[in-house]
Amino acid sequence: MKIKANNANSPIWKDVYSHSKLPQQLEPLNEIATNLWWVWNHEGAKLFGKIDKQLWKSTEGNPVQLLQSLSHKRMEEILADKELAEIQKVYADFKAYINVKPDKTQPSVAYFSMEYGLTNVLKIYSGGLGVLAGDYLKEASDSNIDLCAVGFLYRYGYFTQTLSMDGQQIANYEPQNFNALPLTQVLQSNGEPMVLEVPYPGRTVYVHIWKVSVGRVPLYLMDTDIPQNSEWDRSITHQLYGGDWENRMKQEYLLGIGGIMMLNKLGIKKQIYHCNEGHAALINAQRLVDYIQNDGLSFNQALEVVRASALYTVHTPVPAGHDYFDEGLFGRYMGEFPGKLGISWQDFIDMGRENPGSNEKFSMSVFALNTCQEANGVSWLHGKVSQRMFAPVWKGYFPDELHVGYVTNGVHMPTWAATEVKKFYADKLGTKLFEDQSNRKCWEGIQNVSDEEIWNLRMTLKNKLIDYIRVQYKDSWLKNQGDPSKVVSILEKINPNALLIGFGRRFATYKRAHLLFTDLDRLAKIVNNEKFPIQFVFTGKAHPADGGGQGLIKHIVEISRRPEFLGKIIFLENYDMRLARRLISGVDVWLNTPTRPLEASGTSGEKAEMNGVLNFSVLDGWWYEGYVEGAGWALTDKRTYENQQYQDQLDAATIYHCLETEIIPTYYAKNSKGYSPDWIQYIKNSIAKIAPDYTMKRMLDDYEDRFYHKLATRSAHISANNYEIAKQLAAWKEEVAQHWDSFQVESFTCDQDLTVNGPVVGKEYNFNLVIDRHELQGMLGAEMVVMKEDPEKHTLSPINTAQFELMKEEGSKLFFKLTTTPSEAGNHKMGFRVYPVNKELPHRMDFAYVRWIQL
């Protein structure tokens, strides 16, 4: 027999993850580590830092990874040391917090979002939308709200940014090791992973479920990157905002359809269903199916029930920022739903179109508006922008009349206030501040704190940031093979005593990061003034598909390398939550320059406010409401030029002028103690008069007061007695819709001729209207609408609506009368409209049937 020289098969590997096992006495550390309570409770994070300072740093503040890497020797040292008592104390505080039961007097909420910014350790966020959602969960926990959240556990999350030496952004996608993250996998009773089966076109997608404990609030994350799925489907939860439009469709289908199926599987049912952006709109498609299949409701009845418990929050100020899907692509994924709902495909897809019956793409936002009873923007100004943006959905009404409201965004103060700041507030303002953050009286005491103490606090935070900038900038420079001698020269130019202005955000072109660099000669004079030194630090990521945003980054990096700007303009790579916390607490001024009104809210400036950092911003988003003279600086909200390039040049000149004549002189009006009393007064005013209005506590309270309670009450009302009111309302709407075209205006007169000279101010006019409803059974209302006309701007704005009084009803005829007296002279337009009336309607847009009639 011939003997082969080699006989071996391929290695057979099994993935295993080795980690340290904690002794029983240290088990509380695991419990604390897997609950994100430690993110905003300093004693928790401090505890892990003390256990192993180097490990804490190398794991980037990940307590789970730290404990898994802890040496046996270090464990024994902890057990033998007084650290054990400290662990027990922190654990006792943690348990006391966690064990508080939810406040059942507040409505329960299911919250859906594509991203959550909770900690840099969990890379399931990209920017402001996610960080806001993360802050919301933290405050819901602190406020003891019965809330659960739904999202995705991304394998790669959002990208890590590095910059080449010439400033070109490089996007790196690094896989997350789920076993080393502060989360737990949801298991079945037999200890095996719970698997959710979601029907996709021609196949089933299998989903694992993970739970992140955000204090008292559970966040359930779906994960398709498992062996049961094809590579194509495993990638559904690979990247946040990655891939093509089909991948986006697959993701939003999973978030909506799969999200509701997951809650059903977990046995979770809430009173309110909150869509954080249109990405989650399809939750209502699955909820409709559930009510039809489980409760025997018709489509229209189910729609009443679903709408009454649903809220849609829009974060996007322009139509182009919303998701639209081609009918073919949308139909591949949602084609079976009309059959489940008992309606036609045309009726179903029209729910996502501004103009039903057209060939428009399916809009997730329009579908959300049609299936959610309430909707809101994220600042007062954005609420107004949203009304104009969504006006085509309700063509019988004008933007200012729409039900679209607003809740101005806020930030979770315990997360974003630096540790030193929180300690300072506790010492100087009292711990009650943390329990009642939106109460201005709790903040007013800052006016009584000595100027010197505030200045010392600000300098402490600034020096920490400067130290970090030096280390991070040097590491990035050397990593990119930059000239070592040059980086030393740059670092030497960084002056801790100089006025430091920060700019950190997503690099979208409308954010106008380039604005400061419009006139480089003027900027060079400003930053090279030896008597009044000033420095700028920039940071931010551009979406990998956004060439314009990446070009802005490259442009700024190139400028920062010029001799006149070395050490004066600094760009830091890889903007994330950790870097954000350092910046918004360490700079002196936070700069924001968006094109108005494209900043829906913006929250980075609010985070700066919590730390006594002053804002210098365009009057847009939250700053439009928040700006207080003597507590920050603002660029005017007035637009001088239609040409954006000219407007940019004017705004840039305004920035330079404000720096030269207000900000820099105020900062450098220093006394013998080395600080400017005027500058400190700005800080005091900012903390006392602005900060309390922009906490997440105030924001959550607003959602409760403006939407959650209202929806919960209505939902309970129409669902009572086997959905009695919902069924009645659906039947009434069906009847009105069927016979709407049958009613006729029999007569419509005014007691005086309005066609010759028009109405006279102060004179009384009487209108009489008779309507014959014919087959229409429901009640009707009528009103006069007066619009003021601005001939220069070619705009109309409603100034008055006057309701006709129903005088009598005879058979199918309705007799109305209106007596009115004009009160304002000028160019006006006057019109009359008829609409259906039912006391069960929450607002007119809920059933927007309108007929305009002619006098």
PLM ranges: what are they?
Residues 1-855:
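Catalytic cores of carbohydrate-active enzymes across secretory and cytosolic contexts
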